[in-house]
Amino acid sequence: MTRLSVTTPFGRRSLTLAHVASQVVAKARPPEKAVHKWNIFRAICTAKNALGVPERALAVLDALLSFHPETVLTGEGLIVFPSNHQLSLRAHGMPMATLRRHLAALVDAGLIVRRDSPNGKRYARKGRAGEIEFAFGFDLAPLVVRAEEFEALAAEVAAEARALRLVRERITICRRDIAKMIATGIEEGVPTQAGGQGPADWAEIHQLYRGIMIRIPRIATRQALEPTADELS
């Protein structure tokens, strides 16, 4: 039987199954694994919507990472222990209530783990040689364990953004070409029908074009835009 040791939060904060899962993930970290903290932070920023992390929570995560002295996260010393006042200053003066809300969001998203002391304070105990023997604060270990997941999500988001940009470019080029062809057709009196087929005149073509364009929503996904791009092509 596997023994599971879980750290419970101080005070009125509740312990959820998601919090337990995050602690299990943190404990599963291979001791030799190392990641560049700012590379992972950038990946999380890119994948924030997929991870359900609010924009301002990223400012708090940025501040937390700045309290870790190393650029590479590895080994056991991944707990940072700034006070809320120190965190607020690093997060550009974020109000305390907002700071606490976004810290909770980071915990709920499984990006950090709370390691609360008996009195709820954040601090570290050092040995005789000055090394940290144990600390209470926020454990950054999930960032190391889930690094590949964050990078994969960021790559998916970037690929989707590129695909959306390309389909928007297709539509822009088609709109330009169609508008110029309609203008030229009207000015030059070019016939619109070949063998009795097709729209009766350029005004009808323009109406068909307008009908396609007004169906495009202001904020559209790639899946919504691709049929329009195909129709205009």
Where are these regions (language model features)?
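Short loop/turn segments at secondary-structure transitions that flank enzyme active sites
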Residues: S66, P118-G120, P142-R146
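Short recognition helix of helix-turn-helix/winged-helix DNA-binding domains
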Residues: M1-V80, A183-A203
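Winged helix-turn-helix DNA-binding recognition segment
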Residues: E70-K126
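Electrostatic interaction modules used in gene-expression and signaling proteins
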Residues: A179-S233
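Intrinsically disordered, low-complexity acidic/Q/S/K-rich activation/interaction tracts characteristic
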Residues: E156-V157, R162-P191
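Short, solvent-exposed positions on alpha-helices
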Residues: E55-L58, A97, Q223
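Extracellular structured ligand-interaction cores
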Residues: E55, N84, A109, E133-G137
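Short, amphipathic alpha-helical interaction segments positioned at domain boundaries
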Residues: A129-L166
